[in-house]
Amino acid sequence: MVRGDDQLNGLQGGKRALDILCVATERTVSAFAYEEIGETSTEGDKRRERLRRLRRLINYSLSTTMNSSLSKRLKIDECKNQDPEQNPNRVASSPSSCHLESKRPQKVVSNKPVRNRKPVIVTDEDRTPTEWLIDVMREVNGMDAKLIFVKVLPNSDVDELQTRLMMPWKQILDMDFLNEEELEKIDRHHKKISASDKGADVIVVNSKGLQRKLKLKRWDMTSTSNYVLGLGWNKVVTDNILQRGTRLRIWSFHSPDMLFFAFVLSDPDPAPTECLNLLAKLCEETTCLEALQEANRMSSLVSDTELDLELRL
């Protein structure tokens, strides 16, 4: 039986091999600098951008595979090693029999099958606040910045007919981003205590400083509970040109009297087929560059020879 650490070592070995391939590709391309062959800076920038996207896809795919495989293996090993007598009251302690006893949200687990989505890998770069976010916080006297959510947007989150952003609790990185007053407002709306209860106010801000005021609410579904940004969401989609595949990071922070969500966006990751096309194009361009450099070298040798003959004559 292959243990979790053995499988991890195997996956890490595969990652090292592909890292070597990626670095070799990069060095091959960089060996033919555009300054030496008359290539424009724009063409060079485009080539480096394609290489950057290729490396990002390789690292992303490997990280996803490693995390998913290791998690499954460790879960299987844990179940096999568990003593049945340690939990004789399994039915009574099932998550489906639990209920929320306070307004502080608890992550809900269901025993019903749900549609699996690829996990979003959160990197160290994701957890580093951007400069514009820090500037916005200074302007409004903001504090307590937290990375609370990372999501690759599906069609449903940018569909103008659905008009909402869904934030499942089990995907939220830090549930402790709301104060007691905001929790109270969300809870009152969820329980439909009064028609005047609309949820908690939140201001969404982007890198351009554009702000939109929305309502944060709670929706319960079969598989999980969610926080939802609803009315006015379509304007946010338009403001930020959100589309299917956009990678969205949400940072929360508080001014003295308001909750803020800062939207940090990344371009959609390239598809695997695009990755292969990029690699093929890089190899083709590298061959052309090598041929051009060799032609320039031969031309230089011919010129030197002719000059030498003229001097001798």
Swiss-Prot record:
Annotated region (Disordered), positions in chain: 80-110
GO CC aspect terms: nucleus
Biased composition, class Polar residues, residue ranges: 84-99
MF terms in GO: DNA binding
Compartments, record wording: Nucleus
PROSITE patterns on file: B3
Swiss-Prot/TrEMBL keywords: DNA-binding, Nucleus, Transcription, Transcription regulation
Matches recorded under Pfam families: At2g31720-like (PF03754)
Feature: DNA-binding region: 169-267
InterPro entries membership: At2g31720-like, B3_DNA-bd, DNA-bd_pseudobarrel_sf
Name of the protein: B3 domain-containing protein At2g31720
Organism phylogeny: Eukaryota, Viridiplantae, Streptophyta, Embryophyta, Tracheophyta
Annotated gene: ARF70
